[in-house]
């Protein structure tokens, strides 16, 4: 028995996507426009962390701009906008997904350097280096996401004039190309960042438990703990379920797993976890608040210590 003989009923996803994406569009548009305005025009202290957060907000906003087209498609179940916009929308989805993961990881590493190695890292933690890292992140995510759009084109549904987008990759494409792309983006865009986030957060917590460190920096331990907690919760809540499910989905589409119960479970989980992942556009501003508040205080404390 192969997966093609299993039940593939997942039409509930269209209603789910339409509702969730509509909420994400409204909240994400407002939150990220406000964030970009603050980072660009009103923020008095701009450092390397601000650079990462600004790029994260831009990544979110670019994806949010594509949501009205997706919402229309999921409601009407027809893509009238052409192949080019379909490819752009697919590219921006993966660019935002893994760009968000990598920029959040940059923030986590920056926090690790600021707290665990506050003075030795001063030459590394510069706005110039942060810009270089951001360029590298954009190149990496575009290199990983753009190839996926090459295999995405609009197709007619059952010989009608209605066309599809975002779905229906043939299994031959999954077996030859897409499975390799998934392996690349999962290793570079998810597993390595996940390990870095957990490791950096653990090292920061160990450092904060040293009385000498706390008294020297006079940094509120409570604020840092809140920042780490919020960061890890948002990272794990938004990205872990989807990426684990994506691996299972890839195994299903390449017919590595052919059990019908597994196929049914994965087809049910995939739309749900994708909606959770997309919601990161709304949660990222929470990271901005806790990160900018704590890092600003940390930089001030370090500057005072250097001047004394």
Swiss-Prot record:
Any Gene Ontology biological process: G protein-coupled receptor signaling pathway
**Listed SUPFAM superfamilies:** Family A G protein-coupled receptor-like
Instruction: Please list the GO terms describing molecular function.
Output: lysophosphatidic acid receptor activity
Cytoplasmic-side positions: 44-52, 110-130, 207-224, 290-308
Q: How does it sit in the membrane?
A: Multi-pass membrane protein
Cystine links in this protein are 86-165
Q: Summarize the protein's role.
A: Binds to oleoyl-L-alpha-lysophosphatidic acid (LPA). Intracellular cAMP is involved in the receptor activation.
Name this polypeptide is given: Lysophosphatidic acid receptor 6
